[in-house]
Amino acid sequence: MNKRKEVFGFRKSKVAKTLCGAVLGAALIAIADQQVLADEVTETNSTANVAVTTTGNPATNLPEAQGEATEAASQSQAQAGSKEGALPVEVSADDLNQAVTDAKAAGVNVVQDQTSDKGTATTAAENAQKQAEIKSDYAKQAEEIKKTTEAYKKEVEAHQAETDKINAENKAAEDKYQEDLKAHQAEVEKINTANATAKAEYEAKLAQYQKDLAAVQKANEDSQLDYQNKLSAYQAELARVQKANAEAKEAYEKAVKENTAKNAALQAENEAIKQRNETAKANYDAAMKQYEADLAAIKKAKEDNDADYQAKLAAYQAELARVQKANADAKAAYEKAVEENTAKNTAIQAENEAIKQRNAAAKATYEAALKQYEADLAAAKKANEDSDADYQAKLAAYQTELARVQKANADAKAAYEKAVEDNKAKNAALQAENEEIKQRNAAAKTDYEAKLAKYEADLAKYKKELAEYPAKLKAYEDEQAQIKAALVELEKNKNQDGYLSKPSAQSLVYDSEPNAQLSLTTNGKMLKASAVDEAFSHDTAQYSKKILQPDNLNVSYLQQADDVTSSMELYGNFGDKAGWTTTVGNNTEVKFASVLLERGQSVTATYTNLEKSYYNGKKISKVVFKYTLDSDSKFKNVDKAWLGVFTDPTLGVFASAYTGQEEKDTSIFIKNEFTFYDENDQPINFDNALLSVASLNRENNSIEMAKDYSGTFVKISGSSVGEKDGKIYATETLNFKQGQGGSRWTMYKNSQPGSGWDSSDAPNSWYGAGAISMSGPTNHVTVGAISATQVVPSDPVMAVATGKRPNIWYSLNGKIRAVNVPKITKEKPTPPVAPTEPQAPTYEVEKPLEPAPVAPTYENEPTPPVKTPDQPEPSKPEEPTYETEKPLEPAPVVPTYENEPTPPVKTPDQPEPSKPEEPTYETEKPLEPAPVAPTYENEPTPPVKTPDQPEPSKPEEPTYDPLPTPPVAPTPKQLPTPPVVPTVHFHYSSLLAQPQINKEIKNEDGVDIDRTLVAKQSIVKFELKTEALTAGRPKTTSFVLVDPLPTGYKFDLDATKAASTGFDTTYDEASHTVTFKATDETLATYNADLTKPVETLHPTVVGRVLNDGATYTNNFTLTVNDAYGIKSNVVRVTTPGKPNDPDNPNNNYIKPTKVNKNKEGLNIDGKEVLAGSTNYYELTWDLDQYKGDKSSKEAIQNGFYYVDDYPEEALDVRPDLVKVADEKGNQVSGVSVQQYDSLEAAPKKVQDLLKKANITVKGAFQLFSADNPEEFYKQYVSTGTSLVITDPMTVKSEFGKTGGKYENKAYQIDFGNGYATEVVVNNVPKITPKKDVTVSLDPTSENLDGQTVQLYQTFNYRLIGGLIPQNHSEELEDYSFVDDYDQAGDQYTGNYKTFSSLNLTMKDGSVIKAGTDLTSQTTAETDAANGIVTVRFKEDFLQKISLDSPFQAETYLQMRRIAIGTFENTYVNTVNKVAYASNTVRTTTPIPRTPDKPTPIPTPKPKDPDKPETPKEPKVPSPKVEDPSAPIPVSVGKELTTLPKTGTNDSSYMPYLGLAALVGVLGLGQLKRKEDESN
């Protein structure tokens, strides 16, 4: 094997400085910037006043925002995917080395070429592929060297054989030449004699011919003169005859005319005769017809009778003949058999007699021979016994001598073989040692030569690059300056037609690659080129013109089983189609491979040998496209689509499901996923590279579009192509035909200006194009065509539902159609670094071998004796086979004869009928005979020219026999050129490997959560995976993984160690970095068999995420043997509560809300709320940011809760009215609510829940909880469905008597994390009704409370209602005055008035001024028996008052004092069914001195409030002095010093007493009420 010395320069390379240095170095100096958290992350009850940065989420626990990433983490992630160094890979070359040795031995010139650098394999598959390529290359080289060696050996042998053969052939050719020369000379002499005789005969014949020719020519001239004379006479006679014939014809035609007239009259008369004859004939014919019918019937009967008789007669005669013949034949056969039998038996008897004689003679001969045999046999046996005894004696002497010789030789051989074995052992040790020296020398030489060759190549490259560097740098800087200037101009013109709306330089030069090499892999089916050609041939109109038009291809011709092949086959206008044209490239050569895909299947195309493509001036070596037939494609007529993949990647693909029938509501889309690679076979990471999306046609029945793409759409100003709903197409107009559907130009070329825009070289091709700005190593875009009505509404101009072909040709390239887009063609050059020259090795000297021992001389073995052959025994005679006599033939049997048949009898015939007689017909008169045609004279016969006499035949000069060609002297064949000594070349290959790594992020259930959401406090695991180590790798001496963790991630060292067996795990708290080093046992496993791949172990980091709205990004570094380092991909997970999260569009702040609403659903936060009103609290359970969450089952089991910390001093809960619904109003089940009077009254589980969420309730609270957290998570949380809780609460009635503010706050708890709502504040106004006593309606008049009212005096109770402040929450439904007066002292007159106490604003904007009479808006009820008057505002009036308006009214009840005494009175003001008592008024009526006898006043009927009467001012009678002895007329006899029963001397409790009295006595339940909201 060719050994290659392993050289690791890692310790001095950039790997140590960049990869490890970035992590390990930063880890040593990084300063932790993450707040230290308690071990129990859910316990947050610390009272320390620590200033922290919060997230914008109203979190109650763990509110801190995520800190800045550590320097180590930032630097590591910035270098994600980067690699330094590589691991060498060895591949065996034993067969190649042997082939080289054999070639040298055969004399072949062997040259070792420079070692082939196979580069660096970056994946296991690529590594295996490259190792296979090297093995294949070695095998191929060995095979070629073997073939060359064998061929050369055969050529040497063949050369010698050919030389001998040619010498023999040259001699035979010379002998043959001499023989042919002699025969040639004799033939020449013979031919010359014959030619002289033929020439003399020819000259005599020529003289006679010339004489005969002159005589013939004279006779022909005389004949011509005679013919001319006869011709003149003939022409004169012909003229005379023609004139006479014309005159005769004229006379004949006149006679014919006259004859015709006469015959016409005769014909008329004959017609009458003809009719009479026809009548007579018709009668005769009828009779004749009947006769013939009768006759025919009789004849038929006779014929049938005759036929029957003849048939029977014939059958009889045939049968008679057959019987007679059969009997005769039988008789003749019998007689012949008797005769033959007699003859045969006579012959047999004679033969049997001869057999008897032959058998007797044979027996006598046999007996004599047997006697002689027995005598000869006895003599032979005696001679053989004597010979055998002599042989046995000689054999015994031979065997004794042989044994002696063999033992002597065996002893000599054993001694020799031992000496040989000893010699071999010594030399084997020397050879082994020399082989090691040789291998070490060869390895050192190979390594040195490889290094030297590389150094020389690197040095030449360095010198060249050094010389070119200034020019390259200047060219780069000049181009950058030009681009910068161009971008300034583009910015000025970005709104002009054809310019990019977002100016940019094109960093991707990817316009045309006609020489690209294509390879395909697919899970669909590859198609044969012959099948594709056969399918194209059905397009006879184009195919016959040698045009390949994919748009017409009927894919149903590609669906047969034998159309499929296992490997890619190219088709196009090349090979036997060279000179054909295509609609893809006209006369340009176009090649493509074909596949057949079902929906969802894909084909991966790898394009290599790229020559003209660059990114930022850097060469692109390879492009890989994955084309997938989109599952949403709606083509109908087939289930598979054809993809023609062009070898030029910039031409794209042609996709078709067209079967010859256009389809409605159809579509075909291809998803394109692609990656570009540089010359080091590394994916190119694009940074806003522009990809052209062009030729997006839109007709009224079809739209071509791009969708589902990575990157950003860049519009070209003036283009019809735009972006809508994430799709790129002509969004606003058609672009097919000028003037149609807003199209500015016509797509195809015609006479219109600007037409033909749909061509890459059209100046306005930008009209149907746009661009996509892409970033990252891998991008994607889906392109296709769809029926217009599937995208936009049906329209007779813009979108018609006609059929279309489900096919499209599209290309994705860098040919941006916008004008003046500058291209970046120059890569920024890197200053070259000079290589280091290697040192030549010192070679070891091989040791000489021991000489071989001398072979011994052996004795010859004796010659064995030869036994004299035995005499053969004589042959015993065989007894003869005697002949058997033949038996006689049996006599023939006499035949039995048949009887002859009976002859038939004929039936008599019927008689024939009488035949009718034919009538006598009249004879028609003959016509006049036609005139006789004249006899014309015959025209004279023209003279016949006498033929010329033929000229005599001129004799032909004889063909003289040519003299034979003399034989050519043979040219001796040249002896063959000796074979040229061939030269064979061979080389070794070097290969490096870069094992790939991958970081995965999972939740506690092992679910991948990369780029998703998990709840705060969730356990998050990072798995650090490395692909299998390749076969042929060097020994693994170290295997280290370093992971700088994200801030806000609580690392669990113990759990990490448990999950990372096979590694020593350490954690640096200062830099928040964990390091894993493979243990010795793990390294031993890796090194157990270096010739085979080995799977690696992977450690797992375990911890929790602690911040709301945080993004946790992480990658790690793998370092192997200090020779290879690589940084992994970056994984990312986010916690909810982060707006503008690119991975989770629904993510936003977690903000539960609480809003107070009235029953109409209006927001009443901050408004005045009347006692007795119901607050419809609307609690929003904010879950939309959790959409797509992938939290673990452990996190889900922490549950989902909603807490309402309500003010129990002001509100009563209404659990019967609680509702839970989703955002669409659908009722939600599975959520329970429980009310607790205090935290202490709640279960321990609830107390712990609130404590861990850091929520402190003030008193009573409600707890809403998900009954089944897992189902709740599945249905609402993971779907991002927020819930709305309607939680009605009623303001306590007694709270209106004191008034005051009340506050309300709620919390949602998700996964154990709490979030608070805003505080909702409302105020309950204090309602304080007032009562006065007045004598007028003037509100400024004196209040008589506590004063005197005269007997029979009319006065008013002024009832001032409570003030309803402005900005109140509820409409007034009830505002009433209930006065329970003392009917013993007061009499209600039935008159009242109600006035507005202040300005009122109505909902329609009108204003009712203070003091306005509102009596008409009230109703009154009187209970005279119990002394109760109720004045109630009409509800429809109350509801017209604006909520923004205050309200207060007062009512005057007119009373008459009818008794003496002191009377007290309180009224009740009811507001929305809540009663408020007024102050108590007291008045006294003294005994009048001379009272008039009162006139009884009838109890008045209630007045119609709609027609009020103004109460009259009562007249107070002047008291008269009465006789003191007369009794005083009072209604109730009381002592003057005693208060009435309705009075009291303590009014402090009267409001409550009055309310109780009204409820108990009057029954407020009888007042008109609104129905309860729950009904």
From Swiss-Prot:
One of its GO terms (cellular component) is cell surface. Residues 1543-1575 form a propeptide. It holds the Pfam family GbpC. Its main location: secreted. Residues 1-38 form the signal peptide. Residues 862-872, 901-911, 940-950, 961-978 have a biased composition (Pro residues). InterPro entries: Adh_isopep-form_adh_dom, AgI/II_N, Antigen_C, Cross-wall-target_lipo_motif, Glucan-bd_C/Surface_Ag-I/II_V, LPXTG_anchor, SA_I/II_PAC_V_sf, Surface_Ag_I_II_A_rpt. The modification Pentaglycyl murein peptidoglycan amidated threonine is found at residue 1542. It is found in: Secreted, Cell wall; Cell surface. It is a peptidoglycan-anchor. Residues 1539-1548 have a biased composition (Polar residues). Residues 873-888, 912-927, 1501-1523 have a biased composition (Basic and acidic residues). A motif (LPXTG sorting signal) lies at residues 1539-1543. Induction: Induced by growth in the presence of collagen (at protein level). Belongs to the antigen I/II family. Adhesin that mediates binding of bacteria to a variety of host cells. Plays a role in the bacterial invasion of dentinal tubules. A host immunostimulatory component, it modulates the innate immunity response. Plays a protective role against some antibiotics and cationic antimicrobial peptides (histatin-5, HTN3, but not beta-defensin 4A, DEFB4A). Purified soluble protein stimulates human epithelial cells to produce IL-6 and monocyte chemotactic protein (MCP-1, CCL2) probably via interaction with integrin beta-1 (ITGB1). This is Streptococcal surface protein A. The lineage of its organism: Bacteria, Bacillati, Bacillota, Bacilli, Lactobacillales.
